[in-house]
Amino acid sequence: MSFELHSLWQERHDDEHKIRRDDHRSPYQRDRARILHSAAFRRLQAKTQVHGNSLEDFHRSRLTHSLEAAQLGTGIVAQLKKKQSEFKELLPSDSLIDSLCLAHDIGHPPYGHGGEVALNYMMRDHGGFEGNAQTFRIVTKLEPYTEHFGMNLSRRTLLGLIKYPALISQTRSVKLPNPAEHQRRLKAKEWSPAKGIYDCDKDLFDWVIAPLSENDKSLLSQMRYRPDSDLEHSKTRFKSLDCSIMELADDIAYGVHDLEDAIVLGMVTRQQWQEGAASQLADCGDPWFEEHIGSIGQMLFSGKHHQRKDAIGGMVNALLTSISIKVVDEPFQNPLLAWNACLEPHMAKALDVLKHFVSQYVIQVPQVQIVEYKGQQIIMDIFEALSADPERLLPIHTKELWQSATSDSGKMRVIADYISAMTDGHAQKLHRQLFSSIVL
């Protein structure tokens, strides 16, 4: 099987003429370097992956999560090249998949989902806010590696970062909920954001997909289903091969490695594991889990670090080696869209069990939700203050961007960009400076 990819996929929006002597790196090696050295990537070290009330420093940050996802991504690619060698030409290089996994979370705001909901609510009349859309915006526009095009990454890298290839105006619910009487009474589940690309970044999205045929462009933005309610968002069906690998790496890191955090920090008990995951994993239909689920539980909760690591590694390996490349169920012409990496059905079910367990017993528990709620309030307070008197309160560079914006929505987007880039600690400190009665 031969796959010819047009050189357009290695192009950058801005045709750079960098002063670089004897630079023999591939476009994707250069992309990886830009991401790794960016301020947006560094900030991930101070954005927590799972918010709890523990004082321990064992837990993962968004940065360590991204590093683990990158390691998993290169592992997936390596085993696919051996397992299905006919796709060797089409599969991403290590530098490309590394780039996608390292960058996939850089648009996430402080305080995780709480911060995302807060910014989406404050931006409800100005195009919304969503973490993946913000990632695309950072790499294509905001990160100051270039003057106008962010990191100026290659086109294939940008396509791989787009998990939801449609504009938010296409995926957003027909109606929005009524605004809360007071921000303290805001219900987070009512304001979870629609997934997609900001409408204000349409020109950059159009540039990324320009090499595709009209048929492929049309198919790419198709939705999975028609929502049952006018208040329900739509969701896109398709993504590129590279993106499908990155997403699997992200999901495995979330479902398995975040589980490890929860066990070490005492957030889940063995009984909860038995009731919430072990029995379903034993019945998922995969022989590996049926055979090993008992010993996995013993090792995870043995209290011995090496045994827990062995169990985690075993689950990761079982999932990773169950991934294969399959044809997408629509007639895409471009091979980057015609094929996706997928878990075998039984293992997909097992990963869903793990992700649901982490969500139910780790993310949705009160001690985590209290921190997210507090963060949600902090972000809304800051947004309200900055948008009330931006020329007085914004830093000089951000104020200049605000002044140069030509519409109200553009001005609000500048404020959202500024707040979403903050670390958890930066947001907390600014909130104290704005609202605490203690003189700082």
Curated annotation (Swiss-Prot):
HD domain segment(s): 62-255
Domain of life: Bacteria
One family name in Pfam for this protein: HD_assoc
SUPFAM superfamilies documented for this protein: HD-domain/PDEase-like (SSF109604)
InterPro entries: dGTPase, dGTPase-like, dNTPase_2, HD/PDEase_dom, HD_domain, PHydrolase_assoc_dom
A GO MF term: dGTPase activity
Keywords: Hydrolase
Biological process annotations from GO: dGTP catabolic process
PANTHER family: DEOXYGUANOSINETRIPHOSPHATE TRIPHOSPHOHYDROLASE-LIKE PROTEIN 2, DEOXYNUCLEOSIDE TRIPHOSPHATE TRIPHOSPHOHYDROLASE
UniProt record similarity statement: Belongs to the dGTPase family. Type 2 subfamily.
NCBIfam families, sorted: antiphage_dGTPase, dGTP_triPase, PRK05318.1
Record's protein name: Deoxyguanosinetriphosphate triphosphohydrolase-like protein
Annotated organism of origin: Vibrio parahaemolyticus serotype O3:K6 (strain RIMD 2210633)
Lineage, broadest ranks: Bacteria, Pseudomonadati, Pseudomonadota, Gammaproteobacteria, Vibrionales
